[in-house]
């Protein structure tokens, strides 16, 4: 892979001051600088957010919407960035079921070793079983010498004559009988004697590299044929293999990888169901035996009253046949036990609500038992008590020894050890063990190499002491981050930008060098690594240093240096460089007198501690250090801290003693971060805000105006800005950066509060101050000053006092927490325990921390720190070191002395500490080595066997344009989408927590492939089927609507939909101004109405607690604590009763703000002679006082209830019945006949009254225009047929009679925008969203160039970028409000293309489905250029190419074949296929024919009906007065560029004219067939037999068989779609999706019906040895031969055979077919079953999805239709199909407004005479066959 520059400019995130950075891909970039300088803002808030959001936006909506919570970074331009992954501390906090072994794939590698070489054993006797897995058999055969001839044999299970005939029909030619090979035909008449030992020869081949795929296919066929048995003959040596063994009625099969996963269904422990934990009930009262499950008899079980648990429990009750309402004591012990502890392989079908689908969906849940579910949570948590009720206890499962594995897996061994024993070994011991393992097998060596590599990563990262079964949730933050790094290294993803957050945290200095090596490996895999680091040693790791500073917060945010590390050390003058050069150092304090008081801790044995006793000095700074895993946390956090807590509770722990001293208080400052929200600020955290608010409330003006302390809190409604609720910012949508509130300009408060000053500053000014400024400002207020000084003492002086805690870095949060504790220091001698307090701190900040910690010891307190940072260790008064290693080798006390004494010892810390004390610390050595190139830049696919693929291996070069060619159904789609796309999605999704990745994996089943390596994140661009077409507009599909809605929400000005006047804003201040103007000196009562539907008693109780005391109703006031009358009218909470006067304006403002905080509407009562009520709502109003809501993003979106049009529900279109438009269709009916057609049982009198009796009985065509309109539209006595039919449609939406009369028409209310009136009247520069949606992209670009503010710059920039890509794919002409489902195939595909490429990322693997098919030749260069640009931008493009048109432009081509279906799926040599070499810029293609056979076209006889034509004069959309005619009984082709109007001509022109002629009966054709381009819509249930209506005849035949009659089986019982016939467990699907929570879905054949879909009883009926389920698996060609006597099915079967689909099973699911196969099916259905009556076929781009082989015979077939008396008009872009027509119509010359004109009409051979034609240069000039 080549290294490319990455540019990021104009970064304004948080404190970054419009900075720009650059670096190269595949570099290690180290971001450094003082804490709070802006490093995390660049790394995480800019680079990570941008890379992640851009890639996620291309994923399916259900996944993308789950994880787009990151705000868009404020940045001007990003170029060259690849998809990003952030690895932070606590990286796996959401991975509830993960262990070290499962996450790093150690267990999956070990399971594979057990599968291939493990010894299966009998669980009872432990005796070895002689079994082979498929992989083991293959591995054994692969060890044979190259070039040896081998025969693969399978035992012959049946030897009778009928069986021999059947084998011969299947293509087998030889058998091996008693050691000798014989031709199979020699036994056709006699059969084979029973006493002969016979094998059938599956295949004979030479073992070579070229034959591996064939070898795999033949071997697996042999095992399937021999039901688990086969043999291999080579050089007269016979090797026999068996995959089954039966002992005591138990059949044992070979070991599989799934057996060694506690999450797999069959392999889990039968007692704990895979959790490894046994939960015992110690208190029997936890279960109330008198209650039922429905009544929640088990207090620890999920609540049955919830929908989720009730559904699951009901499914359990149905499966076990018991009632949920039965008391527990009356349930059988077996059911009780299953409820509590589950049952093996118990899978429940449940219908749960699926949020991604928006409906209930059938899924299958494994029932493990409620106790085992609890055990599962306990197994993976650090706080088991959270899940254990009192009276319950958790123990390791006695049956599986805590592994969760079943007994068969538990006793299996490999290299003398069980899987359980491996799980309990440390990673160091694993490494020692596996380094000794030798294997002659190449495949085993490869697995061992991968496993050893992962172990090396983990050990190099200092994690060797961990055991692989350690739950990730129990690891420290640093351990989790380093485990994540190892996981990513093992995953071998390419092209990722990894962003690491201080990976050296928690790492001892001796392990840092190993960490450096591991991170370099991550880079050398082809990734970019961004490090946020402070560790000096990490400087030697970086390829580039970016130093941010110079200070922190507002004093930072600038790029001080960007370049090579050596230049940084030599030339930079920043604090970081000075500390590295030791120009600045942290001094070691002078030695103190010997301590006089000590703390003694004895008998420390928890975890790996070796019975330690320690002695710690009091009133000193003590450092506890040691290598990772040595026992520091166990000693301090798990032993010392609990002992101190017990001592302070006066429980006198035996292991704690004091010598001449004591501890009176414990402060344990952990690394757990405090709650962070936008409403928490530093002032609130250190408790200084209360004092400041009291100070402002005590000012004279505050006292005069009645402003209290609450008014100065932005979290209280009294003073907070009503618009932003006190936040100071407004968020347009979740993924946008907040913008300053337009009402308070970011000040958080309303104006009256801001008028209160103290020393010239208001409360907002105080919040804007830094701690440095505030410390000086409040110098005269000791209480406030002391608290702010605590921040400054910890170098947080730069921090704005009002900055939300949610925006602080990790280092800032740690110091803020410490400042909080320092403020509340006690006179009691306190022990402060800190766990790595230097986390996130720069060396400069560490110095301040040390000063604070030492000051505490000078006050007599004791400070104990767990620390690896040598700057801290060197200044400690006393040091404890644990070691010497981690895990079992740790837990010893190596040193207990002063730092100076420590460096005299030979310990790991002593070696690291010595240079710091002696002042001999060297500047890190910088090795300017270029990154080593990855070993392989290829995407490697091994053993791909999805669908038709024949276990192929291949390598695809990265950063190339790759074409995958081959016939239809040869495996192209399976390879590109089912394997590459699925593998890439799963690999990328697995880098996220399970709660996120679960959504994507739901839609991504595990691919059938051995291994895929070298993938980058993938993006697919597929053809959309009709069922997947969106009703959204172009603007919505491309993300333009979202940006425009945000833009109008910020800049839009509302106008009245009624008067079009500009609206004025209603705010609390405008309400007060109105009151002062109209009711000055009157008294008012300000109230908040009680919400309708509220429980009045409960509501009032809550309000009483909040301090409200009065209720208002009908002019009366009531105390809330008194008895209230019933049936109160308009009750409202009283906020305030006051006089309207300027003096009271602030109290009025406060009261109104409080009222609005309680409800969206407030009522103000004016106390006059006649009391008057005023109602107000915030928002906008017109001059007459009509109220309108606030302008929000939701209000401007048709996807939200607030914004959508009520008439059309936001769709922009309505269904309409207008009989006036269909008069010709219904002209022959009388009014009474037409009425009774829809309402046969209704009363006819209204129709007769409406029309004269004689007219009601006449045909509609004889009515006058007025009478016909009355009949359609109605009168006062009769609503009209239009209205009646619309009412009928509401109750019978699928009525076949009404559907032809329906038409979609633009909604008159919203004019097609989908927005309500108000939203359509929000304008910018007098332009509304409706105006924009009615224009094209060019108009929008011009509009955007006229507007813009600082707040909207990023939105406008994003919109302009999207418009650029719309232009690139040639769609600028399309109206933005046009619906997506109205686009042509080519337009729709380019729409998806524009969306996917607009992310502008690098290192993506783009997967395209036929990018050049269905395009006009003129558009081909545009798309090819786009694909090449993607490659030039360092991406990989892989595209299927059935037409071979991309191959000439590809860098690499793969050919699959040689045939379709079972005959395809092999990897072919490139020289076996001849493909066209197309010059996209030449007049004539260089090679015209692919495949080789030339098209043979016989011209139709034009004399018959040659004078009959179909004429149209069309005006619609951009087409005006287009006059064109098409001859009938001829092949008529329509060509033209996309968007020129071809489909409009076909459907709005020729189709409607044909319907009119048919209605009049004045045409030579009597039927009309319209065929669109969409592949046939498919569901999980539809198959070929149902689509062609073959299944009913076959079902009827089976039902007529004697056996069916004897069993009383009707034809419906052979249907997979009826309850009587379908298998009840899989609902007739033949398979089950096993929901494995956050693992990819597993598809398994249904065990009940064995995948045959029909119920077992129906499988008893056989015909020629096959039941109906087996018949559905039979190829079409075989069905045609077997059932020639069923006449009804011969026509569809012949059509399928003629088009070349005979290889497909008759019951093949339509959803499983390739696009080419689906199109071929549709073609066969409509065109190969010739209708009996003369028919006009209108075909809209159907043929573009056919492969060349099927397309070769298409002109001949179309010609046969013409010769049979039919007419064909088709749209296509294929030049060969266009020139094969009798008559060609070309529309153009451009798209949209530039199209719609007739360029040519006539014979294709005359096109060269045309001056206007664009097609003529593509059509061959040779003479067409006559």
From Swiss-Prot:
Transmembrane segments: none annotated. Keywords: ATP-binding, Cytoplasm, DNA damage, DNA excision, DNA repair, DNA-binding, Excision nuclease, Metal-binding, Nucleotide-binding, Repeat, SOS response, Zinc, Zinc-finger. ATP 4 binds at residues 1536-1543. ATP 1 binds at residues 33-40. It is found in: Cytoplasm. GO terms for biological process: nucleotide-excision repair; SOS response. It holds the Pfam family UvrA_inter. ATP 3 binds at residues 966-973. The keyword DNA repair applies. InterPro entries: ABC_transporter-like_ATP-bd, ATP_grasp_subdomain_1, P-loop_NTPase, UvrA, UvrA_DNA-bd, UvrA_inter. One of its GO terms (cellular component) is cytoplasm. A zinc finger (C4-type) spans 721-744, 1623-1649. It comes from the Bacteria. CDD domains: ABC_UvrA, ABC_UvrA_II. ATP 2 binds at residues 626-633. Residues 1-581, 594-909, 1503-1814 form the ABC transporter domain. One of its GO terms (molecular function) is ATP binding. Forms a heterotetramer with UvrB during the search for lesions. The UvrABC repair system catalyzes the recognition and processing of DNA lesions. UvrA is an ATPase and a DNA-binding protein. A damage recognition complex composed of 2 UvrA and 2 UvrB subunits scans DNA for abnormalities. When the presence of a lesion has been verified by UvrB, the UvrA molecules dissociate. Belongs to the ABC transporter superfamily. UvrA family. This is UvrABC system protein A. It comes from Chlamydia pneumoniae (Chlamydophila pneumoniae).
């Amino acid at each position: 892979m080549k290294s490319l520059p990455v540019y990021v400019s104009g970064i304004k995130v948080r404190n970054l001051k419009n900075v720009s950075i650059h670096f190269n891909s595949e570099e290690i970039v180290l971001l450094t600088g003082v804490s709070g300088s802006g490093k995390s803002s660049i790394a995480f808030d800019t680079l990570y957010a941008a890379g992640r959001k851009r890639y996620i936006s291309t994923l399916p909506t259900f996944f993308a919407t789950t994880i787009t919570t990151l705000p868009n970074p404020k940045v001007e331009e990003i170029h060259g960035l690849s998809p990003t992954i952030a690895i932070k501390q606590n990286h796996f906090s959401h991975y509830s079921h993960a262990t070290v072994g499962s996450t790093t794939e150690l267990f999956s590698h070990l399971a594979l070793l057990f599968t291939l070489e493990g010894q299966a054993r009998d669980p009872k006797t432990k005796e070895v079983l002689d079994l082979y897995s498929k992989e083991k058999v293959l591995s054994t055969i692969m060890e044979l010498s190259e070039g040896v001839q081998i025969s693969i044999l399978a035992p012959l299970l049946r030897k009778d004559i009928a069986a021999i005939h059947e084998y011969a029909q299947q293509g087998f030619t030889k058998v091996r009988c008693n050691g000798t090979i014989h031709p199979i035909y020699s036994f056709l008449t006699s059969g084979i004697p029973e006493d002969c030992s016979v094998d059938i020869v599956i295949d004979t081949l030479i073992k070579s590299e070229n034959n591996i795929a064939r070898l795999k296919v033949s071997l697996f066929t042999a095992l399937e044929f021999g039901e688990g048995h086969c043999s291999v003959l080579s050089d007269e040596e016979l090797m026999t293999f068996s995959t089954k063994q039966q002992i005591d009625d138990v059949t044992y099969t070979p070991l599989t990888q799934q057996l060694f996963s506690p999450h797999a269904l069959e392999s889990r422990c039968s007692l704990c169901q895979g959790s490894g934990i046994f939960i015992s009930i110690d208190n029997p009262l936890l279960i109330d035996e008198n209650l039922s499950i429905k009544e929640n008899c088990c207090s620890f079980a999920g609540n049955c009253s919830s929908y989720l648990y009730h559904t699951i429990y009901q499914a359990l009750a149905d499966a076990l046949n018991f009632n949920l309402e039965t008391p527990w004591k009356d349930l059988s012990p077996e059911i009780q036990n299953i409820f509590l502890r589950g049952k093996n392989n118990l899978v429940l079908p449940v219908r749960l609500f699926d949020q991604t689908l928006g409906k209930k969906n059938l899924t299958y849940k494994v029932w493990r038992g409620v106790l085992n579910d609890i055990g599962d949570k306990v197994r993976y948590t650090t706080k088991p008590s959270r899940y254990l009720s009192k009276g319950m206890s958790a123990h390791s499962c006695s049956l599986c020894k805590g592994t969760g594995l079943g007994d068969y897996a538990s006793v299996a061994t490999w290299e003398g050890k069980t899987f359980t024993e491996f799980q309990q070994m440390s990673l160091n011991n694993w490494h020692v063990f596996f380094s000794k393992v030798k294997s002659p097998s190449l495949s085993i060596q490869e697995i061992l190499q991968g496993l050893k590599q992962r172990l090396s990563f983990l050990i190099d990262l200092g994690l060797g002491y961990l055991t692989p079964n350690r739950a990730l949730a129990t690891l420290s933050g640093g351990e989790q981050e380093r485990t994540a790094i190892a996981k990513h290294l093992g995953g071998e993803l390419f092209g990722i930008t990894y962003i690491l957050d201080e990976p050296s945290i928690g790492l001892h200095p001796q392990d840092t060098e190993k960490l450096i090596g591991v991170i370099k490996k991550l880079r050398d895999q082809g990734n970019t690594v961004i490090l946020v680091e402070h560790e000096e040693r990490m400087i030697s790791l970086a390829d580039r240093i970016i130093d941010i500073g110079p200070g922190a917060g507002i004093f930072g945010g600038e790029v001080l240096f960007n370049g090579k590390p050596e230049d940084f050390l030599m030339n930079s003058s920043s604090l970081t460089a000075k500390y590295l050069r030791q120009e600045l150092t942290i001094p070691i304090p002078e030695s103190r007198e010997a301590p006089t008081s000590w703390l003694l801790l004895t008998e420390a044995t928890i975890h790996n501690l070796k019975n330690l006793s320690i002695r710690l000095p009091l009133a000193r700074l003590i450092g506890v250090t040691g290598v990772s895993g040595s026992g520091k946390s166990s000693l301090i956090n798990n032993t010392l801290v609990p002992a101190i807590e017990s001592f302070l509770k006066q429980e006198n722990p035996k292991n704690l003693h004091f010598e001449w001293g004591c501890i009176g208080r414990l402060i344990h400052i952990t690394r757990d971060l405090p709650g962070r929200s936008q409403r928490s600020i530093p002032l609130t955290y250190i408790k200084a805000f209360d004092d400041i608010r009291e100070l402002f409330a005590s000012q004279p003006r505050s006292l005069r105006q009645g402003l209290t302390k609450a008014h100065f809190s932005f979290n209280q409604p009294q003073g907070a800005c009503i618009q932003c609720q006190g936040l100071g910012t407004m968020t347009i949508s979740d993924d946008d950066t907040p913008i300053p509130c337009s009402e308070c300009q970011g000040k958080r408060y309303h104006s009256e509060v801001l008028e209160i000053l103290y020393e010239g500053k208001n409360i907002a000014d105080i919040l804007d101050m830094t701690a440095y400024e505030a410390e000086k400002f409040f110098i005269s207020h000791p209480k406030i000053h002391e608290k702010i000084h605590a921040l400054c003492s910890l170098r947080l002086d730069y921090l704005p006092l009002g900055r939300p805690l949610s925006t602080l870095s990790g280092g800032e949060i740690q110091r803020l927490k410490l400042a909080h504790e320092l403020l509340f220091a006690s006179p009691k001698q306190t022990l402060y325990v800190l766990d790595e307090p230097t986390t996130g701190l720069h060396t400069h900040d560490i110095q301040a921390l040390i000063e604070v910690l030492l000051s505490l010891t000078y006050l007599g307190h004791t400070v104990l720190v767990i620390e690896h940072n040598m700057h801290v260790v060197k200044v400690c008064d006393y040091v404890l070191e644990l070691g010497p290693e981690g895990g079992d080798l740790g837990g010893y006390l190596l040193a207990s002395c002063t730092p100076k004494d420590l460096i005299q010892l030979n310990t790991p810390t002593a070696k690291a500490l010595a240079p710091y004390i002696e002042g001999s610390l060297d500047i890190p050595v910088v090795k300017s080595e270029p990154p080593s190139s990855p070993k392989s830049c290829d995407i490697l696919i091994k053993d791909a066997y999805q669908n038709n693929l024949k276990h192929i291996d291949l390598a695809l070069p990265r950063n190339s344009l790759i074409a995958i060619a081959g016939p239809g159904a040869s495996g192209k789609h399976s390879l590109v989408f089912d394997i590459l796309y699925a593998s890439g999605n799963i690999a990328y999704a697995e880098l996220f927590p399970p709660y996120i990745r679960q959504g994507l994996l739901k839609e991504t089943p595990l691919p059938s492939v051995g291994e895929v390596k070298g993938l980058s994140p993938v993006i697919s661009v597929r053809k959309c089927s009709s069922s997947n077409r969106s009703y959204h507009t172009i603007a919505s599909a491309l993300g333009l609507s979202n940006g425009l809605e945000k833009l109008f929400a910020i800049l839009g000005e509302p106008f009245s939909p009624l008067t079009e006047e500009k609206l004025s804003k209603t705010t609390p201040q405008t309400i007060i101004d109105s009151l002062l103007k109209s009711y000055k000196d009157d008294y008012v009562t300000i109230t908040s109405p009680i919400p309708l539907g509220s429980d009045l008693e409960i509501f009032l109780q809550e309000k009483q607690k909040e301090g409200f005391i009065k209720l208002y109703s009908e002019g009366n006031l009531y105390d809330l604590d008194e008895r209230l009358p019933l049936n109160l009218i308009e009750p409202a909470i009283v906020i305030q009763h006051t006089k309207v006067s300027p003096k009271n304006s602030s109290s009025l403002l406060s009261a109104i703000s409080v009222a609005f905080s309680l409800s969206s509407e407030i009522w103000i009562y004016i106390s006059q002679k006649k009391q008057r009520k005023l109602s107000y709502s915030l928002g906008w109003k017109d001059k007459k006082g009509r109220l309108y809501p606030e302008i929000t993003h939701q209000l401007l979106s048709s996807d939200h209830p607030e914004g959508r049009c009520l008439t059309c529900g936001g769709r922009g279109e309505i269904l309409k019945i207008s009989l006036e438009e269909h008069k010709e269709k219904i002209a022959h009916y009388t009014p009474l006949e037409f009425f009774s057609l829809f309402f046969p049982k209704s009363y006819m009198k209204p129709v007769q009254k409406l029309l004269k009796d004689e007219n009601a009985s006449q045909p509609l065509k004889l009515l006058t225009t007025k009478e016909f309109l009355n009949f359609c539209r109605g009168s006062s006595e009769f609503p009209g047929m239009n209205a009646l039919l619309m009412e009928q449609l509401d109750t019978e939406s699928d009525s076949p009679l009404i559907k032809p009369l329906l038409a979609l028409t633009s909604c008159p209310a919203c004019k097609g925008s989908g927005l309500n009136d108000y939203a359509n009247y929000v304008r910018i520069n007098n332009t509304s969203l409706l105006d924009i949606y009615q224009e094209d992209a060019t108009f929008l670009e011009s509009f955007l160039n006229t507007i813009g503010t600082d707040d909207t710059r990023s939105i406008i920039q994003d919109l302009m970028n999207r418009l650029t890509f719309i232009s690139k794919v040639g769609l600028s002409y399309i109206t933005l409000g046009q619906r997506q489902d109205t686009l042509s195939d080519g337009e729709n595909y380019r729409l998806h293309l524009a969306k996917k490429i607009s992310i502008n990322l690098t290192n993506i693997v783009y997967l395209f489905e036929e990018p050049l098919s269905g395009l006009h030749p003129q558009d081909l260069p545009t798309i090819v250029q786009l694909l090449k640009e993607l490659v030039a931008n360092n991406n990989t493009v892989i595209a299927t190419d059935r037409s071979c048109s991309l191959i000439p432009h590809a860098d690499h081509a793969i050919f699959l074949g040689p045939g379709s279906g079972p005959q395809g799926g092999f990897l072919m040599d490139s020289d076996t296929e001849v493909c066209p070499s197309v010059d996209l810029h030449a007049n004539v293609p260089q090679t015209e024919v692919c495949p080789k056979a030339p098209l043979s076209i016989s011209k139709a006889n034009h004399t018959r009906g040659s004078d009959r034509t179909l004429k149209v004069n069309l005006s619609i959309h951009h087409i005006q007065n287009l006059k064109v005619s098409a001859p009938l009984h001829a092949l008529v082709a329509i060509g033209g560029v996309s968007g020129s109007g071809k489909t409009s001509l076909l459907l709005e022109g020729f189709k409607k004219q044909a319907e009119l002629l048919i209605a009049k009966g004045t045409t030579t054709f009597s039927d009309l067939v319209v065929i669109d381009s969409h592949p046939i819509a498919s569901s999980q249930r539809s198959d070929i037999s149902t689509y062609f209506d073959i299944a009913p005849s076959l079902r009827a035949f089976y039902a007529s068989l004697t056996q069916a009659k004897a069993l009383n089986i009707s034809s419906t019982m052979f249907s997979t779609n009826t309850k009587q016939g379908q298998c009840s467990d899989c609902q007739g699907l033949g398979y089950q999706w096993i929901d494995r929570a956050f693992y990819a879905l597993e598809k398994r054949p249904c065990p009940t019906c064995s995948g045959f879909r029909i119920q077992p009883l129906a499988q008893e009926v056989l015909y020629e040895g096959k039941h109906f389920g087996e018949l559905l698996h039979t190829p079409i060609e075989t069905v045609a031969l077997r059932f020639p006597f069923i006449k009804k099915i011969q026509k569809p079967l012949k059509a399928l055979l003629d088009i070349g689909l005979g290889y497909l099973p008759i019951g093949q699911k339509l959803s499983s077919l390739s696009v080419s196969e689906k199109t071929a099916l549709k073609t066969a259905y409509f065109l190969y079953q010739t209708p009996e009556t003369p028919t006009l076929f209108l075909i809209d781009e159907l043929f573009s999805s056919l492969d060349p082989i099927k397309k070769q015979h298409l002109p001949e077939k179309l010609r046969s239709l013409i010769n049979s008396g039919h007419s064909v008009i088709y749209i296509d872009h294929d030049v060969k199909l266009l020139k094969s027509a009798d008559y060609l119509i070309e529309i153009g010359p451009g798209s949209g407004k530039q199209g719609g004109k007739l360029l040519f009409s006539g014979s294709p051979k005359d096109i060269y005479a045309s001056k206007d034609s664009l097609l003529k240069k593509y059509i061959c000039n040779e003479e067409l066959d006559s």
